[in-house]
Amino acid sequence: MRKLLQNSLVKAVIEILDDLKATDISIFDVRGNNGITDNMVICTGTSSRHVGSIAQNLAESCKQQGIESFGSEGVETADWVVVDFGQVIVHVMQQESRDLYQLEKLWG
């Protein structure tokens, strides 16, 4: 049952990110790599305004579907915003931050 819920959550998040025009969406199954979450999603926004908008609208859209976030970090600067849904953590980044931190190398 947990895997089914997890897959539904990942699918919902990806669909919303796509609707919000996030680009370069990557999904990583990190079960066994950390004790924090099961999946990491990374996507890119075109500007700080776009990154902040993606993160805020993602949380709002998920809430409308009955999916509550545990919170978000980085909204003030919006270079890199993290939205925590428990089993899925979403990283919304500007391209410069994504290039600098290279999270794909960490989890890929």
Question: How would you label these PLM feature ranges?
Answer:
Residues 1-39, 43-108:
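Positively charged, small/polar-rich N-terminal and surface patches that mediate targeting and assembly
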